[in-house]
């Protein structure tokens, strides 16, 4: 706001980071509060009332434009209030005092129970300015989509020994690209030949991985060598969300949504009897959850969109999914007879 204006020459818009219309809203288990700022383009000499309403169409457009799948949080699950905490209705709106150019709207979300709001669903609150006295609206900046980042408490699998978790997918032998994802906490990263995941009985080139605290992650495709490692150090005792994306004879390694390295290698393809094996006998009091296999090469934005929350098993292209949590009714894991037990 850098001037003064009357209704005929003033305009109203919703301020958001970088004016992109998106607000990331982090919720604790018992809920959370964030603020929106409707603004006037110029200072007004008289009070202005700005109406803000629920706008599912704005979320539908966001999902379509971004390939996202956020569901609208119902109006009954949140409240709007002014900066002092007085609850607002859509008809009342928020008041901008004379001589000012903005107001704060408090958005308050209570506890979202897992029965009504499953952890594998992503929610957003779509809000738009619907009117402001006789002022015009800036169409490209009238909406704010609040993307909810929820803190989810979940059980995980604790693993020691065994021969890894083996997944035999159906139909992958016809696919030229794929994505493997896993989430793990390693108690240490100095063990010899500690693998994250590998492909057994593949019909194309070799895919075998190792993980180390100093050299990062190795993608072995027929040979060893320093250049087969990402050379980015990793920490034990922290969640590592690891993603391998293979397409066009390239394998890209991501950790926690960030590219570590792109490896040039041969085509790595599945056979009809191929299995993905996650881990090996090197497990020592490590934690695992969220093992996923996709029959497509996920993009970086898709990887980050799906990174932390449980998935809907019906998600397109998700071929195999092991959430490894009691909440998702995963039972205790036992290794085959004759091998060391894998415990949960």
Label the model's feature ranges.
Residues 290-344:
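Extended recognition patches within non-cytosolic domains
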Residues 29, 167-180, 231-238, 269, ...:
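Extracellular/lumenal carbohydrate-interaction signature centered on repeated Trp-anchored short motifs
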Residues 149-158, 185-189, 208-265:
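Extracellular glycan-interaction surfaces
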Residues 113-124:
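Short glycine/proline/serine/threonine-rich loop/turn segments at secondary-structure transition edges
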Residues 178-188, 242-244, 291-293, 322:
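Short hydrophobic/aromatic patches on beta-strands that form ligand-binding or substrate-lining surfaces
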Residues 152-216, 298-303:
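Extracellular glycan-recognition modules
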Residues 1-25, 139-152, 261:
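Bacterial Sec-dependent N-terminal signal peptides
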Residues 260-288, 312-319:
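Flexible glycan-contacting loops in extracellular carbohydrate-active proteins
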């Amino acid at each position: 706001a850098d001037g003064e204006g009357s209704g005929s020459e003033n305009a109203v818009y919703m301020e958001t980071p970088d004016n992109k219309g998106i607000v990331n809203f982090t919720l604790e288990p018992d809920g959370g509060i964030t603020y929106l700022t409707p603004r006037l383009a110029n200072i007004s000499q008289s009070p202005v009332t700005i109406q803000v309403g629920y706008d599912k169409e704005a979320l539908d457009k966001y999902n379509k434009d971004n390939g996202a799948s956020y569901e609208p949080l119902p109006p009954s699950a949140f409240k709007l209030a002014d900066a002092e905490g007085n609850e607002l209705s859509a008809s009342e709106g928020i008041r901008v005092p004379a001589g000012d150019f903005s107001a704060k709207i408090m958005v308050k979300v209570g506890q979202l129970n897992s029965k009504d709001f499953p952890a594998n669903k992503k929610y957003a609150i779509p809000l738009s300015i619907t009117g402001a006295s006789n002022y015009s609206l800036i169409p490209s900046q009238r909406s704010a989509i609040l993307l909810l980042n929820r803190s989810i408490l979940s059980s995980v699998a604790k693993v020691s020994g065994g021969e890894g978790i083996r997944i035999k997918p159906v139909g992958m032998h016809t696919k030229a690209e794929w994505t493997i994802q896993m989430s793990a906490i390693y108690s240490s990263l100095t063990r010899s030949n500690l693998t994250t995941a590998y492909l057994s009985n593949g019909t194309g080139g070799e895919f075998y991985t190792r993980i180390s605290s100093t050299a990062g992650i190795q993608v072995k495709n027929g040979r060893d060598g320093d250049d087969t490692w990402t050379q980015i150090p990793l920490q034990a005792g922290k969640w590592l969300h690891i993603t391998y994306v293979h397409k066009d004879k390239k394998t890209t390694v991501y950790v926690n949504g960030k590219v570590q390295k792109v490896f040039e290698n041969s085509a790595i393809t599945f056979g009809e009897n191929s299995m993905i094996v996650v881990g090996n006998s090197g497990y020592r009091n490590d934690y695992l959850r969220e093992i996923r296999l996709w029959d497509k090469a996920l993009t970086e934005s898709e990887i980050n969109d799906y990174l932390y929350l449980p998935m809907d098993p019906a998600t397109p292209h998700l071929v195999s999914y092991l959430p490894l949590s009691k909440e998702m009714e995963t039972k205790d894991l036992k290794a085959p007879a004759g091998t060391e037990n894998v415990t949960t």
